[in-house]
Every structure is written in structure tokens, then in C-alpha cells.
A protein has these predicted regions:
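A hydrophobic transmembrane-helix motif
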Residues: 1-46
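The feature captures the beta-strand-to-loop junction immediately N-terminal to the Walker
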Residues: 126-128
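Helix-to-loop junction immediately C-terminal to a conserved catalytic motif
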Residues: 141
């Protein structure tokens, strides 16, 4: 409402100014102080001045609205930055203590969840759609603040994440992999081998929106980019969804072979070869962990994991 009123007042002031200006010009011509021939150029200058005045007032109103939005965004960013508890005596583990989160208070996506992800271990996170698998990764990364409970990590800057869909730029593969931190060509070539793209050249242009690549190749470039700048914790959210089974298994195996990194791997795919290599499989249902254990243990129990796997839901 304030912005609308500001715009209306500026229009009234501009119209009043132009009316007074025209009256003054008319009186000057009437009393012989101004030649009629100069009237049109003066009117044109007046119109341009009024137009610029209107633009300035409109921009001021726009700046006011942006300022309000910017203030709200900064508050949101500040709250997200304080979502997790960053501990100076961090021992490498990620601890979730009675964490609850929902986009609305009436429906919790994560419900009173407690778990400790131990440093260097590899965790598969499975479950049906909407069970909270991807949400828990976003909470750990600090995308959203937990409404209840604590999430203890060292710092979100020490967490890498690979999303289901990668975004790339109309540039060379080298620049797409390097981003803000430049790596050696040797390192970048190893990252391309990691995602089974050894034939790609670093100076090769990707094209606008990856037009020179297939969807699977775009995703693999995104994975290689994260591997090139790997942090202590690696979060993976359905990263092989667009890949064929053989390529997906190869990349999953290489991620599982990482020695020191803690890996949280959300997946819907059920490759026995890779699932057996995870230190622990967590089964999510309605925002809670309903089962956990090794592949062999969960298959032997014939519970929720067994059912999901046989139905092809993971």
C-alpha cells in the first residue's frame, strides 16, 4: 500500500508541476516576453523532465520494496546459518538429537529423529518417496533450520553435496569443474575418470545448458565437479537417477571406496553389489528411521527394507 501511495503522489506532483509550467509559458507569450516559436521546444524539454521525474519516483518505490524483501531474505539467511550447532570440539561425527522439521507445523517431515553418523563411515538412506530422506540432507547442510532439536556438525563449509540434477555453464569442462577454486589439470582428469568420462577434454565446450552433452553426461560432470572439491562429508541425493545401471554401479563403487570421507547416500536403486558395501543402511518411513543395519542383517530380518527391495521401491 505504501508503495502504491508513493507512486500516486509522484504522479500528482508531476502533473501539478507540468500544469504550472504551461501556465507560466502561456503568460510569458501573452505578455510578449517569449516568442511563440520557442514554445514547442520548451514543451518537449518539459515533457522529458517530467518523464524522468516519474522514472525516478518509480525507481525509489521499487528500491523501497526491494529493501524490504532484502531485509527479510537476510533474516532468513541468518536463521538458516544458525540452524545447526557448530562445535569447536567437533570429533568428526554428525549428531542429530531429537530433530523435527516440517514445512508446516501441522505436518512434520522429520519427526523426533536422533542418530549419530560416525566419521569416515558410509551410510545408505532408503525409503519410499516423501519419507524424509532428502530433507535430512538439506537439514545437515543448513538449507533449513530444524524446528526442534540439534544438528551438530563442524561447519557447513566442510560438507559437499551432489544433487539429483546438476547445473552446468556454457563454458569449457575445465571451467565447469574448477568453479571458484582452481585445481591442476591432473586432478581434473582424474575426476573425469572417476565418473567414467576419460575421453573428455578439459578444453571441450559444454554448450548452453549442456547442449553438447547427454543428460547422463551432464550429471556426471556435476559429480566430477564435487569430487574435485571434496570436503570431509559428502551428501548424495539420488545422484545416479539419470544414469544407466552399469555406470551407476561404477560411480557408487568409487564413492564407497573413498577412504576418509563420511558419505550419506540417498538412493532408490537397489544394487546388491553396492548396498552390501555400506557400513549401515538406514530405512526411513514418515520422517523416522524404522530400520538400520547391514545389507545382510536387513535382508535376514525380512522387514521394511526387505519389502521395499522386493517391490523395487529402492
Amino acid at each position: 500500500m505504501a508503495i502504491s501511495l508513493t507512486g500516486n503522489w509522484s504522479i500528482c506532483i508531476a502533473a501539478t508541476f507540468q500544469l504550472i509550467f504551461m501556465l507560466v509559458i502561456g503568460l510569458m507569450i501573452l505578455y510578449g516576453h517569449l516568442n511563440m516559436i520557442y514554445m514547442m521546444p520548451i514543451v518537449n524539454v518539459s515533457n522529458n523532465f517530467i518523464s524522468n521525474l516519474n522514472d525516478i519516483s518509480s525507481n525509489l518505490a521499487g528500491f523501497k520494496s526491494v529493501s524490504d524483501v532484502n531485509s527479510k531474505l537476510l533474516n532468513i539467511i541468518d536463521s538458516h546459518g544458525q540452524a545447526n550447532k557448530f562445535e569447536s570440539n567437533y570429533d568428526g561425527n554428525i549428531c542429530l538429537e531429537h530433530v523435527s522439521f516440517g514445512y508446516t507445523e501441522s505436518k512434520m517431515i522429520i519427526d523426533d529423529l536422533s542418530f549419530k553418523f560416525e566419521k569416515g563411515k558410509k551410510y545408505a538412506i532408503v525409503g519410499s518417496s516423501g519419507s524424509g530422506k532428502s530433507t535430512i540432507l538439506k537439514l545437515i547442510l543448513g538449507y533449513y533450520p530444524a524446528q526442534k532439536g540439534n544438528i551438530s556438525v563442524l561447519d557447513s563449509k566442510n560438507v559437499s553435496m551432489i544433487h539429483q540434477e546438476s547445473h552446468i555453464f556454457d563454458d569449457t569442462i575445465r571451467n565447469n569443474l574448477n568453479m571458484e577454486l582452481v585445481q591442476t589439470d591432473e586432478t581434473l582428469l582424474k575426476c573425469l575418470e572417476f565418473v567414467d568420462l576419460p575421453e573428455f577434454k578439459l578444453d571441450q565446450n559444454i554448450g548452453e545448458d549442456g547442449s553438447n552433452l547427454s543428460g547422463g553426461q551432464v550429471q556426471r560432470i556435476g559429480i566430477a565437479r564435487t569430487i574435485a572439491h571434496l570436503k570431509e562429508v559428502l551428501l548424495c541425493d539420488e545422484i545416479t537417477a539419470s544414469l544407466d545401471a552399469q555406470t551407476a554401479i561404477e560411480i557408487e563403487n568409487r564413492i564407497l571406496d573413498l577412504k576418509d570421507e563420511t558419505v550419506l547416500y540417498v538412493t532408490h536403486k537397489y544394487f546388491d553389489e553396492t548396498l552390501k558395501k555400506f557400513d549401515c543402511i538406514l530405512v526411513f518411513k514418515q520422517g523416522r528411521i524404522v530400520e538400520q543395519g547391514s545389507f545382510e542383517e536387513l535382508m535376514k530380518n525380512k522387514g521394511c527394507f526387505f519389502s521395499l527391495k522386493n517391490k523395487g521401491c529402492i
